[in-house]
């Protein structure tokens, strides 16, 4: 029986809830072509995890949650889509985005914040778009090598979810299934992705949420710092 992970209670109330989904299933052929092209560059662990998701049939992923904390969806602020149609926002009030949908986008936002701080420190005022776009958008980023490091549990979010988001902004699929570029400055996909197996410690993997591992305060104490 389902039960609360917090209290253990089986007094569960089932509620209906409307959510937004990232249509990952549409991108499976494009992702497979991209990932297969990285076999000689990425560790086998990474490509095998990514291709396993595709081989099992890529499912659309819910990208909103009913939580009090998170990046708000704010659907009432949305404008029309590229075809001019307004989205159906009924039932989306109070939703927040799923963390692994919005967190990788922050990689781009962090670059903008860095570029802005650099420009202000240099006395040039706020950053210009090209100051941060040259790291993320083609053709300005043609000379950039983009590398990610992560544990194996985060590989799917960076080989499937985030690439789907970027490809979906860069390209459009026609009714006949063909894709065409619609973004004059397409977002750059990761070049090198290094995924690693978990490090076990006292019978389980290192985990911040479970407080298992050697953390900075403990490391400093061991070093006598």
Named regions from a protein language model:
Residues 2-225:
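Structured secondary-structure scaffolds
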């Amino acid at each position: 029986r389902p039960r609360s992970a917090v209290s253990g209670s089986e007094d569960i109330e089932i509620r209906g809830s409307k959510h937004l989904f990232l249509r990952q299933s549409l991108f499976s052929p494009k992702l497979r072509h991209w990932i297969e092209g990285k076999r000689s560059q990425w560790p086998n662990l990474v490509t095998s995890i990514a291709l396993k998701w595709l081989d099992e049939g890529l499912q659309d992923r819910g990208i909103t949650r009913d939580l009090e904390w998170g990046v708000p969806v704010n659907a009432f602020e949305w404008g029309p889509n590229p075809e001019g149609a307004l989205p159906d926002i009924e039932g989306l009030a109070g939703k927040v985005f799923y963390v692994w949908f919005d967190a990788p986008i922050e990689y781009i936002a962090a670059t903008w914040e860095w570029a802005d701080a650099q420009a202000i420190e240099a006395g040039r005022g706020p950053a210009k778009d090209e100051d941060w776009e040259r790291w993320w958008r083609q053709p300005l980023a043609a000379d950039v090598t983009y590398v990610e490091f992560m544990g194996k549990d985060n590989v799917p979010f960076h080989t499937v979810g985030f690439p789907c988001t970027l490809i979906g902004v860069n390209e459009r699929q026609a009714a006949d299934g063909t894709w065409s570029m619609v973004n004059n400055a397409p977002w750059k996909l990761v070049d090198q992705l290094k995924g690693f197996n978990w490090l076990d410690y006292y019978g389980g993997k290192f985990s911040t949420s479970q407080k298992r591992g050697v953390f900075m305060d403990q490391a400093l104490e061991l070093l006598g710092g």
